[in-house]
Amino acid sequence: MPAGDLTRLVAAALALAAGVAAVVIVALLLSHTPGPVSTAAAAPAAAASQAPVAATPHVPIPAAFPAPPANAVVFARADGSNVLALAAGPRGRRLLLQASVLGPQGKGVRGLDVSFTVRQRSAHAAACGAGCYRALLPVDGQPRAVLVDVRGRSAKTRWRVALPHRWPAADGSALMARAGRVWRSLRTLSFRERLASDATHSVTSVWRAAAPDRIAYTVTKGYSSVVIGGRRWDRAPGGRWVESSQTAPIHQPVPFWVSVANAHVLDSVRLRGHDVWRVSFFDPGTPGWFEAAIDKRTLHTLELSMFATAHFMHDVYSGFDKPAGIRPPG
């Protein structure tokens, strides 16, 4: 993972845990626009040992991170302050199932009791590493859904996951590559973001980005910033704009994912008047699980969800190549 992205995730998690007073750290780092904030908190995570990911061997992730098996279809959700993810893939007449449980410190959660049920057949999962629980389940015909049952000392979660209507699911790698190129070709982009670290702590913000080096955001009941090239302006709630130097160059608009593995088309749906593909994938570079809604006509990413270490994000995108109006504050 690039150092800037690692710092972004760690600082975001710490800021959310600290509360609204620290929300400026979240906003600055989520934008890929480093500002005048401390990054010392990122050091422990950066020192984590590394291990290759089978699906993308050139992208290392922490050894204690429960990455999905290669080629499996992936799903993810928040479960308290943890990420709960499912990977499913055909293995002949059996179904390979893996639950990944990622804790808020970026390591897999051990010692859980996990089972899977498909069409009234159940299997107990065996541990396959930190936060990794895996089973092979015989299936007759096409599997429609998986029931994931996770039990721990103080928690119990039952999660029903609908599988793609087409099985095996269609590969989405080429589609995500095209969507990434379209994103990088945009002149402007706007989006609304909700970022949470658990069920209690969350912030909402509105963003505008313009090529090649302009971005502006406003956090609900929080900070605002404008970045233009090498200058930035920041404003605390109820305060005045303060001008300073932008400490690192930025390039916008760019996708939030770093790399793509395990990409599959989940289904086709209608979203806000657009025909879209829903695509899920794992990003070893973040690392985290993503789901994107891709417009079939334009290949614009209309919505994006991400589940990473203490970092649960949902973005809704609009204003593609529309005037963004990013100027120095008056």
Per-segment meaning from a language model:
Residues 128-135:
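Aromatic sugar-binding surface patches on proteins
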Residues 200-254, 312-313, 317:
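An acidic-aromatic
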